[in-house]
């Protein structure tokens, strides 16, 4: 019996041991995971993302390319296409620098940035804004603790010297041998680990096959002081009795992937999914896992919500408007008109809703109605973290307690430097963890997607949606009529005639926000050709603009859809687009561009004088205008009156007016909000205690109207239409002494019996929605004599009708006759008598 128990125990023990031998303890922690899944053609200076929780980014250099990989893409330490470098500033790496006294290595610039992938806390003469980590303070600094380094490798070239997989050093770069590195000898027979701190140089025999993907792993066991090497899960070699040591923390520490610190010793092939782990992942043979790309439980509906076909895409002479509401923001449906004008209707300025602003407070606000009908205002404040205010009535806003306290306030929902560079919105195509979305800049390293189940707790997708850095708020909306997510992002690639930055916006479109948006890389020669036709700022190519350690700004890779035009004063910027799809009528896209009038560079000296510090102004004032579109891409901007101008408001004398992204519907009103300051952009004299957020009140559908003059009648005849419904409803304001009449015509412009414009009951008054009526005699005859009624009894012979069902589905035109009136919108509806 005892022997049987002992045998069973031995079997159990063997099972436990066998389970433990292939994959080690479960408390392993990923230090860094670079998937290198950025797009092929990825520009140098742009960020290679770390998919661990430690946020350790790299940047791509002139000595590396993103190419096809084992899983997605990979890093190949081969040179980028050669470019001719323009002259420029030291900060942006365009000036070749002399070797400093006491050193031997030329400081980093575009002239020598031949690294493949790199991070550094040195090279501080350059612009560095992406949040590099100090590698010697992390577990990338391999030493006397359990660790694993593994990756997929595709060797396809042999070299005359060893090739470096990675090198980490205390710095200054290239000035000493204080490094830890793993390299592959030139004949591909041995890997070599160099650990300066422990004075170890360790060779591990390998067995690589050329032109094949292989999984490579190195595992250090600090208990046995051994280092093992695996190929495709098979242990090939182990070195015993070594004691590694971490490097000292360096003031100018760095890490280079694919080359050494002098950008030499090119690794012999492609690297995919490079991972550093604190802990031993393997201690015996194993089967390599598939891709390490993290699984996400954020999903998008298989079929995107689809709205009606855009009227603007109509290819026939007849427009089938069905029962959709039509806002008169342009002449899309107009065939002929006389004496009309499209007019901007600025909102009524309401009360202050957020005041007593202290400290940092970004101008770029977003207003959203949440699932419970509460109104939220998002913006960034301290440290560029995102905060939120909440209101039941849209007037009294409070700070919700989200448990993230910064300087006494608990309403912060993203504790990362996002700068308010996006607009949180509810995605109609997602539920659960991805219901809320926020596309924003992050750490000046690119444009990223954040997701949230409730708009309070957010998570950033690791891979940038687009790798270009944001300088201000990106504006995103879902277009149900084109089934695309549309985003506008500011670019500064153009310059004014006076060589100042001319700000405009590019547009991106995608049907899947969970995957990066791919762009077509532009070569230097392509940029030079563009520069012959447009005023393009130096340097060319544009991705050089921030230096080799900070990503480039938005360039010509995406179409520019919002920019200053010939009507604007010279030296005017379109700072932010603020584009939306109007939620309460199809075919209607509105933008509220923030327009910035520069005092400097352009125009005469009499204009430049306004920036004189003695005047205590600044670089210029800012207003909000309005633009309209029928497809969200092609815009018509109205210059005057300004939609939200500068001037007096609630005892504030505002010099800048930044409207918030988004709007709220309450009854027959649209509420918008804006941030105002009583000082100028780049102010010489600031009044930070007088900054405030205000409510704006707009008539529903009332942004633009067709106005008719007071002195004479105006006429509008539409193009041929098909409609669905039995009533024609009009949003109109005639004031007291204006009026309108409406009739129907056939396609030959003949009046349709019973719906003649002369028989239309005068529309007189202010109506959000009023039925159009026609009069007839009691015998049904509409051909009565007008102006023939001298007493009230005559009206007994008159009946009115608003029923247009007899015209439903027939090709008709609508004729409007107006005087002293504003026409906003129309809609056919079905209504029971």
Which residues are covered by each model-predicted region?
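Beta-rich carbohydrate-recognition and catalytic domains
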Residues: 297-576, 581-654, 673-833
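Extracellular glycan-interaction patches encoded by glycine-rich segments
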Residues: 122-124, 249-273, 280-281, 286-287
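Short, solvent-exposed beta-strand-to-loop segments that form ligand-recognition rims
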Residues: 231-253
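Glycan-recognition/cleft segments
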Residues: 163-193
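Localized edge beta-strand/strand-to-loop motifs within extracellular or lumenal beta-rich domains
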Residues: 212-227, 819
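Extracytoplasmic low-complexity segments
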Residues: 23-127, 240, 284-312, 338
